Regions:
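C-terminal helical cap(s) of enzyme catalytic domains, especially alpha/beta-barrels
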Residues: 89, 102-127
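Conserved anion-binding
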Residues: 1-41, 45-49, 55-63, 68-74
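Structural motif
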Residues: 37, 91-92
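Charged helix-capping and loop-helix junction motifs
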Residues: 24-28, 77-86
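Generic hydrophobic/aromatic pocket-lining and core-packing "Φ" positions
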Residues: 31, 49, 85-86, 112
């Protein structure tokens, strides 16, 4: 895990990180460290996938949690850095993790089907 998707830039100082260290720099530093240590990939926000792939290579896997469909409001959501399924895939995510939008839906199977349709549409459009 690079940085939990529930952590925002403003929380870094409270967690003991230097004031001049940005969240994106911390994520990239941790991804670089993971890659140099022989890891096949990292868990990261969809916002950071493109930058990670840029420094670690296209084959370095990016698993993206905190994925929220545009229509899927999650009450009391603790996630700070979220993306839609379309956004995660367009940014280069290899795998996405969608939990609460399906689990908490009135009809989970329908919600899952809509997310799958969004993924398929995005994959088709990206070619």
């Amino acid at each position: 895990v690079t940085v939990l998707t529930s952590i925002s830039e403003s929380q870094l100082g409270a967690l003991g990180y230097k004031d001049n260290l940005s969240l994106s720099q911390l994520v990239l530093d941790r991804a670089r460290c993971a890659e140099k240590s022989g890891c096949a990939g990292v868990i990261c926000s969809g916002e950071e996938v493109a930058a990670i792939k840029n420094i670690c290579g296209a084959k370095f896997k990016a698993i993206v949690p905190g994925v929220r469909p545009a229509w899927g409001e999650v009450k009391a959501d603790d996630q700070s850095r979220i993306v839609t399924p379309k956004g995660a895939i367009a940014n280069g995510a290899d795998l996405i993790v969608v939990g609460r939008p399906i689990r908490d839906a009135k009809e989970p199977a329908v919600a899952a089907g809509e997310i799958v349709a969004e993924i398929e549409s995005t994959m088709t459009n990206l070619g």
